């Protein structure tokens, strides 16, 4: 298992609320919590930036982290990430923040300490551009947006 440096920025994290952890041995994501001063009501269409009380330092340029929505919040309540996916670079050291967007039709209360997103480590391959005049020909070519067939 990879070690991930973390700093607790909100003293309630690890005391009143558990530190992020994997729920099962097969879990891919660590749950991030809303470390708010008070519960907030997210109105339909509203987006709010929510602190997690945690900063991380990945340090390995071969890794990055992604902040992803929790499936239950999106499916049951219409609460998704305002930026859809948060990408955390390996050299970032600031607080993890979660942009929550209520795409539903009813107000939703986010409680202090509620699990609002998940953090997943992913491998990164950095590439450089090799400028060419033409690409090698392929069957697909430049076709996109449904070009490979329907269902």
UniProtKB/Swiss-Prot annotation:
GO terms for biological process: dUMP biosynthetic process; dUTP catabolic process. Its cofactor is Mg(2+). Pathway: Pyrimidine metabolism; dUMP biosynthesis; dUMP from dCTP (dUTP route): step 2/2. Its EC number is 3.6.1.23. Keywords: Hydrolase, Magnesium, Metal-binding, Nucleotide metabolism. Substrate binds at residues 70-72, 83, 87-89, 97. It catalyses: dUTP + H2O = dUMP + diphosphate + H(+). Belongs to the dUTPase family. PANTHER family: DEOXYURIDINE 5'-TRIPHOSPHATE NUCLEOTIDOHYDROLASE. This is Deoxyuridine 5'-triphosphate nucleotidohydrolase. The gene is dut.
């Amino acid at each position: 298992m990879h070690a991930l440096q973390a700093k607790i920025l909100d003293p309630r994290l690890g005391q009143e609320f558990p530190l992020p952890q994997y729920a099962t041995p097969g879990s891919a994501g660590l749950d991030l919590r809303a470390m708010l001063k008070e519960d907030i009501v997210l109105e339909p269409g509203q987006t709010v930036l929510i602190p997690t009380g945690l900063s991380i330092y990945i340090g390995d340029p071969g890794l990055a982290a992604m902040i992803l929505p929790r499936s239950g919040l999106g499916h049951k309540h219409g609460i998704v990430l305002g930026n859809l996916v948060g990408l955390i670079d390996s050299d970032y050291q600031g607080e993890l923040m979660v942009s929550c967007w209520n795409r539903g039709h009813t107000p939703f209360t986010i409680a202090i300490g509620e699990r609002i997103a998940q953090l997943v480590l992913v491998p990164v391959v950095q590439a450089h551009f090799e400028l060419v005049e033409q690409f090698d020909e392929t069957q697909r070519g430049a076709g996109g947006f449904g070009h490979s067939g329907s269902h």
